[in-house]
Amino acid sequence: MANYFNTLNLREQLDQLGRCRFMDRSEFATEADYLKGKKVVIVGCGAQGLNQGLNMRDSGLDVAYALRQAAIDEQRQSYKNAKENGFEVGSYETLIPQADLVVNLTPDKQHTNVVETVMPLMKEGAALGYSHGFNVVEEGMQIRKDLTVVMVAPKCPGTEVREEYKRGFGVPTLIAVHPENDPKGEGWDIAKAWAAATGGHRAGCLESSFVAEVKSDLMGEQTILCGMLQAGSIVCYEKMVAEGIDPGYAGKLLQYGWETITEALKFGGITHMMDRLSNPAKIKAFELSEELKDLMRPLYNKHMDDIISGHFSSTMMADWANDDANLLGWRAETGETAFENYPSTDVEISEQEYFDNGILMVAMVRAGVELAFEAMTASGIIDESAYYESLHELPLIANTIARKRLYEMNVVISDTAEYGNYLFANVATPLLREKFMPSVGTDVIGKGLGETSNQVDNATLIAVNETIRNHPVEYIGEELRGYMTDMKRIAVGG
């Protein structure tokens, strides 16, 4: 199979990369009706599979789970997940031929095998659904021409898909139809009904493409969403402990600090996050973030280039063929880092203290979001896609670190995201350790500036504020957050 994106000419590539339109709520007036009375069969019952299925059932759809016979016979976790929640469970051979929509929610590395197995069993004119387009775009899966191929990609982990639905809300969702597979012209009707059944239409849906979803998703998760948080956690912890800060305090400041700092980002963008700092601290964070952007821009651009060219996906698929040797080795190394093993502490840290003593963390967030956004948009990805795959998802990933450190983040994200995270962090960590961290002190990470006066130069502060507020990510962010008026707040510090 050939990489689908690389078979397109330049005009087609740019057209697909630039697809992203915020859909009006009126476009979902019929909600999930198009799929009512039809059979939805989900393959895979992990976090996305189970939680999307629960939402779809609660929205009035007929949902069942098709699992491999071995998973049923051995009563594996996927079987238990489905059975304990009262779903019909059967083998591929039993359920797939009945399905009007087969939703493939297995891990990326299983997609080729799963699709090649279920496709001969699917009835004429049925639909095949994905929540990530890697198999179609990067592996170039050829799908039977009578089948409609759609994507509904919630922009958060599966557990959040369920929790937001139960609140009567949803999570922002990208939807797409594969242009090579829409024989009856019903792809958008199916995708919209599926998205509405998960609750996504209540938070906002973006009409996208398989290409735009894959390329932006890979870039976001490798850099700011996971790689930057991992590298930042490791080097900031090392710095604080080396400078005599209590390891328990240092670890807690980072573990819960990312979540607290990005919570401000969620509600008011980079502008509001920076406004949570005192004026002297804001100027310091701005200066640090400018240094970080200069240092790390080549690394961000390399990741974007490797994603666009297909080099990243071919490298990762080679590791799949080698039994995930690199992935598993890097996972073990992460578990051995000092931050992952810091001693627990009862020390209390107030919400504002996370900002005051985490100035460098704020700088890393600003630098990382802006660099990821800039690399994506410079490559033809439209602002809306770049926003969702950088700034918007960051608080959701930071929340996983607050639960169980980097381990939890890497468990919750996909293996594809985890592999890309390590690729980035393995370069970013020594880069920061050698080229940046020696020049910073505990005034920006661990202790705070301790200023007795809030006095700053007026012209400097005005210039800093102007630069922060006039970045393109702030303009599109303000527009898109306007559609998400019911975002929930976190409980600070776990």
Curated annotation (Swiss-Prot):
Keyword Amino-acid biosynthesis among record annotations: yes
Location of the KARI N-terminal Rossmann domain: 14-208
Residues of the KARI C-terminal knotted domain: 209-344, 345-487
Binding site for Mg(2+) 1: D217, E221
List of catalytic residues: H132
EC number from the UniProt entry: 1.1.1.86
Enzyme class per UniProt: oxidoreductase
Sequence positions that bind substrate: S414
Catalysed reactions listed for this entry: (2R)-2,3-dihydroxy-3-methylbutanoate + NADP(+) = (2S)-2-acetolactate + NADPH + H(+); (2R,3R)-2,3-dihydroxy-3-methylpentanoate + NADP(+) = (S)-2-ethyl-2-hydroxy-3-oxobutanoate + NADPH + H(+)
Listed pathway(s): Amino-acid biosynthesis; L-isoleucine biosynthesis; L-isoleucine from 2-oxobutanoate: step 2/4; Amino-acid biosynthesis; L-valine biosynthesis; L-valine from pyruvate: step 2/4
Cofactor names: Mg(2+)
GO cellular component, one term: cytosol
GO molecular function, a single term: magnesium ion binding
Record's function text: Involved in the biosynthesis of branched-chain amino acids (BCAA). Catalyzes an alkyl-migration followed by a ketol-acid reduction of (S)-2-acetolactate (S2AL) to yield (R)-2,3-dihydroxy-isovalerate. In the isomerase reaction, S2AL is rearranged via a Mg-dependent methyl migration to produce 3-hydroxy-3-methyl-2-ketobutyrate (HMKB). In the reductase reaction, this 2-ketoacid undergoes a metal-dependent reduction by NADPH to yield (R)-2,3-dihydroxy-isovalerate.
Full protein name: Ketol-acid reductoisomerase (NADP(+))
Organism: Vibrio vulnificus (strain YJ016)
Taxonomic placement: Bacteria, Pseudomonadati, Pseudomonadota, Gammaproteobacteria, Vibrionales
Gene coding for it: ilvC
